[in-house]
Amino acid sequence: MRAIGVIRNSRRERLSRAEFEELLRSAGYEVLAIVEQNREEHPRYNIGPGKLEELKELVKELKPDKVIFANRLTPSQAYNLWKELRIEIMDRWQLVLEIFEKRAHSKEAKLQVELASLQYEIPLVKEAIRRIRLGDRAGFKGMGEYQTQQYLKHIRYRMGKIRDELERVKADREVKRKKRENAGFVLVALAGYTNAGKSTLLNALADENVEAKNQMFTTLDTTTRRFRLGTKRILATDTVGFIDGLPPFIVEAFHSTLEEIVKADIVLLVLDSSEPWGEIRRKFLASLQVLRELKALEKPIIVALNKIDLIEEADAEEKVRLIWELARERGISLEDVVKISAREGRLEELMDALNRVVLKLPKYGAFRIIVKEPEKVPAVMALINSVGEVLSVEYGEKTRIDAYVQTGMVGEIKKMGAEIERLNHSGEGEELEQDEGYSDGG
């Protein structure tokens, strides 16, 4: 398919030409030309009338299959452009949905794409009905008013059915998530702008040699892998990539997938460090906006600057500094900003940061464990090592073990005959209250 792309930039809306061209290529289009204009939005055509005439001439000369706008078009603008150009018109979000449709493999992903597409169609169908009533016989996809009204009813019915199916998927996922939490797994969500290298990072964390494609939106299906961080068991989940100005109808349609971020213990926000700072800044802010909409900004967030193998060390350090500075300016609390190369497996800074953050989670606590019977020490130590991290051991008439332990395992340790108390900030033990929420197995 051959397309002409159109970008309109203004003081309020700055769009990346490089990103738009990458979207077009990802959707499989041969880009014949890109038409650009700097002006505020024209209410009738989005671009100005003069630029529209230029576009008409290009369409006659190049004979594309479609004209695709980098901007969001109103239904009225899309119709007016079609009437002038007599060629299929698409906007940014139709283009994204087309890519999503190509990438969706699981039943859930296909349902989410269909839901988003139907939500996008509703205002277009309503505009078609309005125009029919004004005497314009264009209709929607050649349909008359009655057929268009019936199609609108069908859309709403189908959306209801899809939402019901997605709710069932969500319930099943919640059951699995609870089982994982109860089994002591720490849940980490990989989030970030599309094509930042999240899938490559997931493979590196899980030590899997699976090729990750260098293209936009390779991940629509939720993918989870497990790995160990010392004694800690981690489940990392790759999520659908963000894009600048992600509209509410796409966020809503993909909520069951994006919910993995909301339910995670830690959010790992991946950025491509090889890009110019202006692009990193734009994508970082766009990612933060999606996290804000998901109400996930209060989660522990680690920013991973990926692809450092492609830049100089001084450049990487400067970008780390700028990320910290930008986060402070925006009032965003970050746990850490680390440099990684997922492709080369250079993850040392990330693993150190994850280890520190995991031990600060509510599901972990610092405890002093007293074992009075020497023969029970090996079994208690083995249990602690399987669900936590030993800080120090003092052997004597009583064995004293200071350790980070999953709080849900306190009851199991007590059942082995050990005494346990929480460590305060000075390293002294404090007796646990009965109502502190720890099960003793009874």
Curated annotation (Swiss-Prot):
<dbReference type="InterPro" id="IPR005225">
    <property type="entry name" value="Small_GTP-bd"/>
</dbReference>
<dbReference type="InterPro" id="IPR025121">
    <property type="entry name" value="GTPase_HflX_N"/>
</dbReference>
<comment type="function">
    <text>GTPase that associates with the 50S ribosomal subunit and may have a role during protein synthesis or ribosome biogenesis.</text>
</comment>
<dbReference type="InterPro" id="IPR032305">
    <property type="entry name" value="GTP-bd_M"/>
</dbReference>
<dbReference type="InterPro" id="IPR030394">
    <property type="entry name" value="G_HFLX_dom"/>
</dbReference>
<comment type="similarity">
    <text>Belongs to the TRAFAC class OBG-HflX-like GTPase superfamily. HflX GTPase family.</text>
</comment>
<feature type="binding site">
    <location>
        <begin position="238"/>
        <end position="241"/>
    </location>
    <ligand>
        <name>GTP</name>
    </ligand>
</feature>
<dbReference type="GO" id="GO:0046872">
    <property type="term" value="F:metal ion binding"/>
</dbReference>
<dbReference type="InterPro" id="IPR027417">
    <property type="entry name" value="P-loop_NTPase"/>
</dbReference>
<dbReference type="GO" id="GO:0003924">
    <property type="term" value="F:GTPase activity"/>
</dbReference>
<dbReference type="InterPro" id="IPR006073">
    <property type="entry name" value="GTP-bd"/>
</dbReference>
<feature type="domain" description="Hflx-type G">
    <location>
        <begin position="186"/>
        <end position="362"/>
    </location>
</feature>
<keyword id="KW-0460">Magnesium</keyword>
<dbReference type="Pfam" id="PF01926">
    <property type="entry name" value="MMR_HSR1"/>
</dbReference>
<dbReference type="InterPro" id="IPR016496">
    <property type="entry name" value="GTPase_HflX"/>
</dbReference>
<dbReference type="GO" id="GO:0005737">
    <property type="term" value="C:cytoplasm"/>
</dbReference>
<comment type="subunit">
    <text>Monomer. Associates with the 50S ribosomal subunit.</text>
</comment>
<keyword id="KW-0547">Nucleotide-binding</keyword>
<feature type="binding site">
    <location>
        <position position="199"/>
    </location>
    <ligand>
        <name>Mg(2+)</name>
    </ligand>
</feature>
<dbReference type="GO" id="GO:0043022">
    <property type="term" value="F:ribosome binding"/>
</dbReference>
<feature type="binding site">
    <location>
        <begin position="341"/>
        <end position="343"/>
    </location>
    <ligand>
        <name>GTP</name>
    </ligand>
</feature>
<dbReference type="Pfam" id="PF13167">
    <property type="entry name" value="GTP-bdg_N"/>
</dbReference>
<dbReference type="InterPro" id="IPR042108">
    <property type="entry name" value="GTPase_HflX_N_sf"/>
</dbReference>
<feature type="binding site">
    <location>
        <begin position="217"/>
        <end position="221"/>
    </location>
    <ligand>
        <name>GTP</name>
    </ligand>
</feature>
<dbReference type="GO" id="GO:0005525">
    <property type="term" value="F:GTP binding"/>
</dbReference>
<keyword id="KW-0479">Metal-binding</keyword>
<dbReference type="Pfam" id="PF16360">
    <property type="entry name" value="GTP-bdg_M"/>
</dbReference>
<keyword id="KW-0342">GTP-binding</keyword>
<feature type="binding site">
    <location>
        <position position="219"/>
    </location>
    <ligand>
        <name>Mg(2+)</name>
    </ligand>
</feature>
<keyword id="KW-0963">Cytoplasm</keyword>
<feature type="binding site">
    <location>
        <begin position="306"/>
        <end position="309"/>
    </location>
    <ligand>
        <name>GTP</name>
    </ligand>
</feature>
<protein>
    <recommendedName>
        <fullName>GTPase HflX</fullName>
    </recommendedName>
</protein>
<feature type="binding site">
    <location>
        <begin position="192"/>
        <end position="199"/>
    </location>
    <ligand>
        <name>GTP</name>
    </ligand>
</feature>
